[in-house]
């Protein structure tokens, strides 16, 4: 679909440009207007409004849905930075509601309970840019085809264990690098294996990068975690439970922002890592049974 074909719903150029504005920054999960203010004061480029952080969603179980509109509107009213909110995978009406609430970005999120196990949301139908998760390049490309303006490597949300985030960002960047060395014939085969259009695969092979920004998420809990994600090739970082489940949220939030900005300077990362109090307790991903691995939601 060309930009002119969906000019009434927002072109891909505009949506991707809005996502590009967040590059190099930290996006923080918040569950109250007060937390949103802390995130903004710490230097977050955006906040994700939700009723429960992923650690609580994981601990409490049950069906996790879109947040209450009153909460979302209260957070929007509290801060000047962009506000994101989550919709369930495939739940296009939740996305319609979020767009009506004037959120700045919609995250079609595996952290919430999927509403459709076959179809993701057709994101071309919306003016609001979408964020979508991916564990590998094929998954990322399928979301881009559907209209996603930002990809985040999934990691394993709500654990405080950065190992899955490391695995997913490494896999995506390695698969992109592999495309750049392929011949045209090999790219045709790769496109088939990735279940993506040849034209998109060829574009990535030529540029060596996705056509949208690539953030990372899931388990980032310390300044060093954030800096490592940036050094591994992320354009920015999502931080969920790691801040407001820690001993000193204000200080940790500011430290993670600074470590993200100065990710290539170990002396800065060392300095901001001092005196942060206890990090979130966390869960080892290796101890999670397959049904409890949120990153496996989506296809």
From Swiss-Prot:
CDD domains (UniProt xref): pdxS (cd04727)
Pfam families from the UniProt entry: SOR_SNZ
Binding site for D-glyceraldehyde 3-phosphate: 170
InterPro entries xref list: Aldolase_TIM (IPR013785), PdxS/SNZ (IPR001852), PdxS/SNZ_N (IPR033755), RibuloseP-bd_barrel (IPR011060)
Binding site for D-ribose 5-phosphate: 29, 158, 219, 240-241
Domain of life according to the entry: Bacteria
EC number(s) given by UniProt: 4.3.3.6
Catalytic activity from the UniProt record: aldehydo-D-ribose 5-phosphate + D-glyceraldehyde 3-phosphate + L-glutamine = pyridoxal 5'-phosphate + L-glutamate + phosphate + 3 H2O + H(+)
Active site, UniProt feature: 86 (schiff-base intermediate with d-ribose 5-phosphate)
GO molecular function: pyridoxal 5'-phosphate synthase (glutamine hydrolysing) activity
Keywords, in A-Z order: Lyase, Pyridoxal phosphate, Schiff base
Pathway: Cofactor biosynthesis; pyridoxal 5'-phosphate biosynthesis
GO biological process per UniProt: amino acid metabolic process; pyridoxal phosphate biosynthetic process; pyridoxine biosynthetic process
Keyword Lyase carried by entry: yes
Function statement: Catalyzes the formation of pyridoxal 5'-phosphate from ribose 5-phosphate (RBP), glyceraldehyde 3-phosphate (G3P) and ammonia. The ammonia is provided by the PdxT subunit. Can also use ribulose 5-phosphate and dihydroxyacetone phosphate as substrates, resulting from enzyme-catalyzed isomerization of RBP and G3P, respectively.
Subunit structure: In the presence of PdxT, forms a dodecamer of heterodimers.
Family: Belongs to the PdxS/SNZ family.
Name of the protein described by the UniProt record: Pyridoxal 5'-phosphate synthase subunit PdxS
Organism encoding this protein: Leifsonia xyli subsp. xyli (strain CTCB07)
Lineage: Bacteria, Bacillati, Actinomycetota, Actinomycetes, Micrococcales
Gene designation: pdxS
């Amino acid at each position: 679909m060309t930009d002119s074909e969906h000019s009434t719903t927002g072109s891909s150029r505009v949506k991707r440009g809005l996502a590009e504005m967040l590059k190099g920054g930290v996006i923080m999960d918040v569950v109250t207007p007060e937390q949103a203010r802390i995130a903004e004061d710490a230097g977050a480029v955006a906040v994700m409004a939700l009723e429960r952080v992923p650690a609580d969603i994981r601990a409490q179980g049950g069906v996790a849905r879109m947040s209450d509109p009153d909460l979302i509107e209260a957070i929007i009213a509290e801060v000047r930075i962009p506000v994101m909110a989550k919709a369930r995978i495939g739940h296009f009406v939740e996305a319609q509601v979020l767009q009506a609430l004037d959120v700045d970005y919609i995250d079609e999120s595996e952290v919430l309970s999927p509403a459709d196990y076959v179809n993701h949301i057709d994101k071309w139908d919306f003016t609001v840019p979408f964020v979508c998760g991916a564990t590998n390049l094929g998954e990322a490309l399928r979301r881009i085809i559907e209209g996603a303006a930002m990809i985040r490597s999934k990691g394993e949300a709500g654990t405080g264990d950065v190992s899955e985030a490391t695995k997913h960002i490494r896999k995506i960047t390695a698969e992109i690098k592999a495309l750049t060395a392929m011949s045209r014939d090999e790219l045709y085969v790769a496109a088939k294996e990735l279940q993506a259009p040849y034209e998109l695969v060829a574009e990535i092979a030529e540029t060596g990068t996705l056509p949208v920004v690539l953030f990372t998420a899931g388990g980032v809990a310390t300044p060093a975690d954030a800096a490592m994600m940036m050094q591994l090739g992320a354009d920015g970082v999502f931080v969920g439970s790691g801040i407001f489940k820690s001993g000193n949220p204000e200080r940790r939030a500011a430290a993670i922002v600074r470590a993200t900005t100065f990710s290539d300077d170990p002396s800065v990362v060392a300095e901001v890592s001092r005196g942060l109090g206890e990090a979130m307790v966390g869960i080892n991903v290796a101890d999670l049974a397959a049904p409890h691995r949120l990153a496996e939601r989506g296809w």
